Amino acid sequence: QKEWDQFYNSFYEQKERSDLIVLGTVEDYTCFAGGLEIATDISLQVDEVLKGNIETGENITVRKRGGAVTVEEYLKSMEDAGITYWNAEDLKAEYSEEERRENYVQISFCDLDPVIGQKSLYFLKKDAEQDIYYRLCDGLGQYIETSPGEYVNAYEIASEKRDENEPMMLALGETVENDPDAAPEESINIYTMDEIKEEMETYTAPPTDYPGAEEEPE
């Protein structure tokens, strides 16, 4: 269970469901293909531990869905898995053997690409079999430090960049600002670490005013 299909309404819920909460810096990352899927392993240096049995300065691996591999690697991954996919022959016809080594297949799930040196707060789940971690609900479990002491959810940034057809990454030094004239549903939430830590200790009841929400018992 990678917690991809879960949604959390508060920092308190994220804290309760996380195995590990750390402030960490991306040291390196590697993309790889498996069948039709592409994933990215991020080597993360732990700068601060907010929850979990781990030491500051350790390195952990955080795996995320999506990434980019060469056309050659992607085709080989399908062949090794015994998968015959509709676009495999199209890829072979479109690219020569040399071009397959120079061109890439990218898969994105409205998520940001990692950037070496970037610092984020991560809410993580431990894999049951491997010594790796997954973010709680993908990008919703990551808050990027967009300026000193300020954090923005990675999914919110990715959604805005997708809507603007911008590259799916936040470059080092690139800041995020809130538009004071934006509608509430379009505004970006910017948190300080003190606000996050305080909300992690404060239970907030889930919203009940959306379609399909269970009615309060009488």
Please place each PLM-identified region on the residue numbering.
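Extracellular/periplasmic catalytic domains that process cell-envelope and extracellular macromolecules
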Residues: K15-E16, L36, I54-E55, D113-I116
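Short glycine/threonine/proline-enriched tight-turn/helix- or strand-capping micro-motif at secondary-structure
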Residues: Q1-F11
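Short aromatic-glycine-enriched beta-strand elements
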Residues: F32-Q45
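Short edge-strand/loop segments of extracellular domains
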Residues: Q45-G52
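Short coil-to-beta-strand transition motifs
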Residues: Y12-L23
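Netrin-like (NTR/C345C) domain of secreted extracellular proteins
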Residues: Q1, V71-E218
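Conserved positions in beta-strands of structured domains
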Residues: E27-T30
